């Protein structure tokens, strides 16, 4: 994980593998981190990844599956089929759209379908899209 700050690049963690922070590429980029990783370890050509549109990823941690998420057209569910336990990542939601207002509105519609502790993260994402 790397962050661009006013003081420069802050490196939190480098992992020579796919990483949770890149799961948004499954729906928001021209090529996913998974395909890029496979290409790298099998010495295949590495096309440059291109961001298709703004994306938001929501980690699902200790959260039961809710099929109502899929009623929202921008939501892509990635469910890991793990036993749900507190603190365990069981999936993630990717939302991607070129229209940031539509993306923010979908996040707003998603809020009541998620546990209350997700609200602050959703609010933060909406602020980044504004």
Label each PLM-derived region with a short phrase.
Residues 51-85:
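Glycine-rich active-site loop/lid that clamps phosphate-bearing ligands
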Residues 1, 46-54, 117-126:
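Flexible, glycine/charged-enriched surface loops at secondary-structure junctions
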Residues 81-130:
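Generic C-terminus detector
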Residues 5-6, 15-63:
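Active-site "cap" helix and flanking loop/linker of ATP-utilizing ligase/carboxylase catalytic domains
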Residues 1-3, 81:
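Short, solvent-exposed loop/turn elements at beta->coil junctions and helix N-caps
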Residues 4-7, 97-99:
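Short acidic-glycine loop/turn motifs at beta-strand connectors
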